[in-house]
């Protein structure tokens, strides 16, 4: 069974995409995210604690207002090298049409060099549900109630 396919409009802002480097693509048949590349002119070294805003070389438009996109880190970069997103997760609204930028942050202990064309993040398109706020005085009781951080334990 194949997943539903929706269009994602992109503008190529860096002519190396689609020629020198592939366009954003899914790495495997079951990948949830499209790999995004660093559209750099030269290698860039991030020393520990540094954050930089990188171009992906594309602009996107989701078109469908029932969708959003999130920019997520690549697990290997974070685990092996300490390279994560500077803003945690990037949220892209369906009506955004500007350049797709990625904030990368070196939270590791060693300098890390990003080469032009390196895969630096992934883009996942998700359905959204818009809500209408209902102001209430009390909530209907749930099994958890107001139990917060650590409430359910670790075992």
Swiss-Prot record:
Its cofactor is Mg(2+). Its EC number is 3.6.1.23. It comes from the Bacteria. The keyword Metal-binding applies. Belongs to the dUTPase family. PANTHER family: DEOXYURIDINE 5'-TRIPHOSPHATE NUCLEOTIDOHYDROLASE. This is Deoxyuridine 5'-triphosphate nucleotidohydrolase.
